[in-house]
């Protein structure tokens, strides 16, 4: 059925009166109510809102994937102008017709790449499949185009990456593969659902730049779904704010940021962590939390030095971690990934040391090495005066009580078949620290301590929001009264207000229990808020380390300054002219077997402030 008269000549997408409902226990539950939007060629529309606001559900409806989630479009119109200028009503298309439309005319980048990529096919085959299907290219032509797209999204060693599987890549690398796949067929409309949430700030800056460049080249309309208002300020032309399934405010990016009218929009903007907000403060500070009902209500600020002087609780000396890469007829080790190269640091009781850096910098591998989830090539890990890197699994078991972890994805960290009470109680049973009523009381206390109710113990993970699931993971980590918690991107995927709540909870627990945190993150504004000290990692090495105030207010290493410059600022008028976009290639940390990485020496430049002075042939010297 033709619809060309109903769509403006410049519009590529028009949605009117969209209503979406989920089926739950025999009833219809409205998820989206009366949402309307328009998207022009070459325009970027940002849809913002917290979890549960309906923004992702709206995107899935446009892709006609919502039916797979047990939902349906109750009413509304969704018109799309295809690349061949034909206008179609998306809800009228058959499944076979939609398979031809998806990818070629409307494409989507999802937030979680590991669940979007097929684990049994190589990266190259998955990108090439889309190119062959929609462009009619040969296998060789499709692989060549796949390599070119990987180069465009700034993946080093792109030829080698083509033959790797998703699990062999870091989270940031997998997200870049997803972006390359979505853009490979140059769609008329690109829907990006939190595409940069899992990426570090420098890669985020380049991905945003890449999307803008390709958008201009192809006159592509972009719907950018995010909760990061800094990203919105950087990329959006217009903004649609969603709250509880409804569009509560829409306007140009300047109108939304400088003259928001709805209380919820004002709440979103006030909750954004601002880099530089800690200037003049040496100690971590709680986030000022506000509510949509009372936008003027701020929590009080509490500053307290929690660091205990004396001996460090954790010492790392000369840690080296490498991963073998096999190739050839006999599957021999020919190259190695130099993930962590000769790093050393200390962590004191009650202190938060943050590890920051790009994807592939080695920060997560460092955390896993400390937990003995990966084995180190050399170096020493000393916990509470005892060397633990040489202990057997049996002797290490009692020490695991004192070192716990919180991972990025709380849903993947919890057993979906068990109640959350069972998951929280499990460490107590393993270590023989409680059973029966005593363990149940401990679980109830832990749930209350992280802001949940004791009766939540009988629920399953899927019955909670992302922020609630992360609180459950924190409760589980606290079950054994640990001395150190390694938090690996623990808040990066959470909404801004939920992120602030979790950070405040971690600070409260540190103040009450004296816990030391190794906080691994790429979110510089959050790192600035929670840290006592910061260590900046680049290609497996620490290039700058010192008190948080010194590193953030007076960064000495060029790589640290690049990280700072790449942080999005939630102000479109200030931000666009001063934006620093990086174009340097990331050197590869893959080396021939037996090849050594040139060492760097850390030199003292201020009280407790160290910066790397690279050797002339080191990649650091090119920054």
From Swiss-Prot:
Q: What is this protein called?
A: Glutathione import ATP-binding protein GsiA
Organism phylogeny: Bacteria, Pseudomonadati, Pseudomonadota, Gammaproteobacteria, Enterobacterales
Residue ranges of every copy of the ABC transporter domain listed in the record: 15-269, 325-564
What topology does the record note for this protein and the membrane? Peripheral membrane protein
Per the UniProt entry, what species is this protein from, by scientific name?
Salmonella typhimurium (strain LT2 / SGSC1412 / ATCC 700720)
| InterPro entries named in the record | AAA+_ATPase, ABC_transp_ATP-bind, ABC_transporter-like_ATP-bd, ABC_transporter-like_CS, Oligopep_ABC_C, P-loop_NTPase
Q: What does this protein do?
A: Part of the ABC transporter complex GsiABCD involved in glutathione import. Responsible for energy coupling to the transport system.
Q: What are the protein's UniProt keywords?
A: ATP-binding, Cell inner membrane, Cell membrane, Hydrolase, Membrane, Nucleotide-binding, Repeat, Translocase, Transport
Q: Which GO terms describe its molecular function?
A: ATP binding; ATP hydrolysis activity
The EC number of this protein is 7.4.2.10
By sequence similarity, the record places it as follows: Belongs to the ABC transporter superfamily. Glutathione importer (TC 3.A.1.5.11) family.
């Amino acid at each position: 059925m033709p619809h060309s008269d109903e769509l403006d000549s410049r519009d590529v997408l028009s949605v009117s009166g969209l209503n979406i409902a989920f089926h739950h226990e025999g009833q219809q539950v409205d998820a989206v109510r009366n949402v309307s939007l328009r998207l022009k060629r070459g325009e970027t529309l940002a849809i913002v809102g917290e979890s549960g606001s309906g923004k992702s559900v709206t995107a899935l409806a446009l892709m006609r994937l919502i039916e797979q989630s047990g939902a349906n479009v109750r009413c509304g119109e969704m018109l799309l102008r295809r690349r061949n200028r034909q206008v179609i009503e998306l809800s009228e298309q058959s499944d076979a017709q939609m398979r031809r439309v998806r990818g070629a005319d409307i494409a989507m980048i999802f937030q979680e790449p590991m669940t979007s990529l097929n684990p049994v096919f190589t990266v190259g085959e998955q990108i090439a499949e889309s190119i062959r299907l929609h462009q009619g290219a040969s296998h060789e032509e499709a692989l060549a185009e796949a390599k070119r797209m990987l180069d465009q999204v700034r993946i080093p060693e792109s030829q080698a990456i083509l033959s790797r599987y998703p699990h062999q890549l870091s989270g940031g690398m997998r997200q870049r593969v997803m972006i390359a796949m979505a853009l490979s067929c140059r769609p008329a409309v690109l829907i990006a659902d939190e595409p940069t949430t899992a990426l570090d700030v420098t890669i985020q800056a380049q991905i945003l730049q890449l999307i803008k460049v390709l958008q201009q080249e192809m006159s592509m309309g972009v719907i950018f779904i995010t909760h990061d208002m800094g990203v919105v300020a950087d990329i959006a032309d217009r903004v649609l704010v969603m709250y509880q399934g409804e569009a509560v405010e829409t306007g140009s990016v300047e109108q939304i940021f400088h003259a928001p009218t709805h209380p919820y929009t004002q709440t979103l903007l006030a909750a954004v962590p601002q880099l530089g907000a800690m200037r003049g403060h040496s100690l971590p500070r709680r986030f000022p939390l506000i509510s949509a009902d009372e936008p003027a209500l701020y929590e009080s600020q509490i500053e307290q030095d929690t660091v205990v002087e004396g001996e460090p609780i954790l010492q790392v000396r000369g840690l080296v971690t490498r991963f073998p890469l096999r190739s050839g007829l006999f599957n021999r080790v020919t190259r190695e990934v130099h993930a962590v190269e000769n790093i050393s640091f200390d962590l004191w009781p009650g202190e938060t040391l943050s590890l920051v850096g790009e994807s592939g910098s080695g920060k997560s591998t460092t955390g896993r090495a400390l937990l003995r989830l990966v084995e180190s090539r050399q170096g020493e890990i000393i916990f509470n005066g005892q060397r633990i890197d040489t202990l057997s699994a049996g002797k290490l078991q009692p020490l695991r009580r004192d070192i716990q972890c919180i991972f990025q994805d709380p849903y993947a960290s919890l057993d979906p078949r068990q109640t959350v009470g069972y998951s929280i109680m499990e460490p107590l049973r393993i270590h023989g620290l409680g059973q029966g009523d005593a363990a149940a009381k401990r679980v109830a206390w832990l749930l209350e301590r992280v802001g949940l109710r004791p009766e939540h113990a009988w629920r399953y993970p899927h019955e909670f929001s992302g922020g609630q699931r992360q609180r459950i993971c924190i409760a589980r980590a606290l079950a054994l009264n640990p001395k150190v918690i390694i938090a690996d991107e623990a808040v990066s995927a959470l909404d801004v207000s939920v992120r602030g709540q979790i950070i405040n909870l971690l600070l409260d627990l540190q103040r009450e229990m004296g816990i030391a945190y190794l906080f691994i993150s790429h979110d510089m504004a959050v790192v600035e808020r929670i840290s006592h000290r910061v260590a900046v990692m680049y290609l497996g090495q620490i290039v700058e380390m010192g008190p948080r105030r010194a590193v953030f207010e007076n960064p000495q290493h060029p790589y640290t300054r690049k990280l700072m410059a790449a942080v999005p600022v939630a102000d479109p008028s200030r931000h666009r002219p001063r934006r620093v976009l990086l174009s340097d290639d990331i050197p590869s940390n893959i080396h021939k077997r037996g090849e050594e990485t040139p060492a760097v020496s850390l030199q003292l430049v201020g009280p407790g402030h160290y910066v790397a002075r690279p050797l002339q042939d080191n990649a650091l010297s090119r920054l």
